Amino acid sequence: MNTNIIPRPEHPQPIMKRENWQNLNGEWLFEFDFGVSGEERGLYKPEKASEYSKKITVPFCPESGLSGINYKDFIPAVWYKRTVSITKEQLENRVLLHFGAVDYACTVYVNGNKAGCHFGGYSSFVLDITDLLKIGENDLTVNARDNVRSGNQPKGKQAGLFYSSGCDYTRTTGIWQTVWLEFVPSGYIKTAKYYPDIENGSFDIELNVTRGGRLTAEAFFDGRAVGSATKEIKGRYARFTLPLAEKHLWDLGCGNLYDLKFTLETDGGTDILSSYAGLREVRIDGFKVLINGKSVFQRTVLDQGFYPDGIYTAPSDEALKRDIELSMQLGFNGARLHEKMFEPRFLYHCDKAGYLVWGEHANWGLDINRESSLLNFLPEWSETVERDFNHPSIIGWCPFNETWDQTSQAAHRILRAVYDETKRLDPTRPVIDVSGAYHEITDIYDQHDYDQNPESFGKSYAGYNGEEESFNLFFKDKQVYIPQLPFFLSEFGGIKWIPESNRCSAADNSWGYGDAPATEEEFFTRYEGLTAALLNAPNIMGFCYTQLYDVEQEVNGLYTCAREKKFADYSRIIAANRKKAAIEE
């Protein structure tokens, strides 16, 4: 196989980076398993390579054009296979096999032996495969099983019908993020967690290691050494403070980051881990959400993380950065990452840009009226919160979105349990239990409102005093208003707009919210009126406009699905977004 061409060659997790790693993206053998019989047929065995009839480009899913497969129907199971060459020197270390994400249930084999399993299509996982390897060529096989119609797994916006329709889109099966090897000594750092202290200018750091030893932590800013600490670790856990000689806060549009270097010396070798962190605090004060002690109106935009050619996977690192740049150019200061846990590389670019984001799970497709749903949801959600904890760009968590099907006491208990666990894992950020729907227990009250009339929309929010609801609810019998909390209109707008030059070729099933404006002038007037109503309300702390770009048949983006301009001049949108908010005064 030609493994010289490596798509997405950049390191997938710059916040946990070692120099000694190997990217496994590129060409793999591939086979559909429509009968889910591949294990019985022994497709995991090295000698079965000849039974793989196709080749796929990893990390792109088989539904995507970039994968080389481009198969759009339902896929219950798939198999991947490739060989990996391992040297004697590499086997003197521990060899870790990382998967950015595999949708949904994954089993990994090395040289015909089961290396491990993982459930969850959005969280990352790692396997120590050292003891299954040999010097020379090794067979690596991956099996993924996926059933978006089951009601037992989160699927996000992946369509449960054959065709994409409404706000459901093309499905993703199997590997959709980078696969890589990492070579570490037997004594190495497994996890790291940073708690910024903006008052004292320091980081409180928690580390989990495989064995005790001497740890040195160093901090740098713009290449200058600005802090260090040493710690003798007796067991497998350490907590210590890393003081900083210079204080540079991470802030909106100013992604100040400290480069961190950890050196762990043990009798099992020396491990060097590169990372970074930002000095940033999120705090609630009445109806305000404070970033570093300052009231910030969150001018966010909905970003669903879909790409025409890669589906869930960006075609390049530049494409990830481009979405952030397009948003900030329009005057947004952040995004609600919607019904998808985005890859860490995207969060890295958010960190660098000073771009606020909300982390949200892809809960759609999971029937939360079943108590068993908690078993399929919570481990994956917890893994992702732990993985992304150190990103300063994430200023809040939202595990669920619009759980309109909540009808049982089991659902209420699940929502509360997930909120409680999220707060246990991360006490430093606010948590919205369910965006736009039932609020069982939440730090911020949020709502979705797609009223397209600026006048009635404005009347709903102008008099909002935080004491009683004055706004529209989709389903009054299914939603609970909670007073005395910060108010976030986390979905609004969604104005359908197809440029006049494209209207003759627009899909018949294209849609947006409400009636589409007849002219650009009408679009801009509506946009200005809707945003002004929220910016002028003294007790509203933020909005999220739907959405940054079109996604397949949903044409309410400010750009097309290919990220092309819909308008020749965006100046009125930019001016509307940048207007000062009442709550910022």
Each model region followed by its residue ranges:
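Accessory carbohydrate-binding/adhesion or oligomerization-edge regions at the termini
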Residues: 1-66, 143, 147-152, 222-224, ...
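Accessory beta-strand-rich segments of carbohydrate-active enzymes
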Residues: 10, 14-15, 20, 29-35, ...
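Conserved, mostly hydrophobic/aromatic
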Residues: 28, 112, 179, 258, ...
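Beta-strand-rich binding/interaction modules
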Residues: 110, 202-231, 238-240
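Short hydrophobic beta-strand segments in globular cytosolic domains
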Residues: 115-116, 226, 296
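Low-complexity, Pro/Ser/Thr- and charge-rich linker/hinge segments at domain boundaries
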Residues: 163-172, 186-193, 280-294
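Substrate-binding/catalytic cleft of secreted carbohydrate-active enzymes
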Residues: 204, 324-325, 334-564, 583
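N-terminal carbohydrate-binding accessory modules
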Residues: 261-327
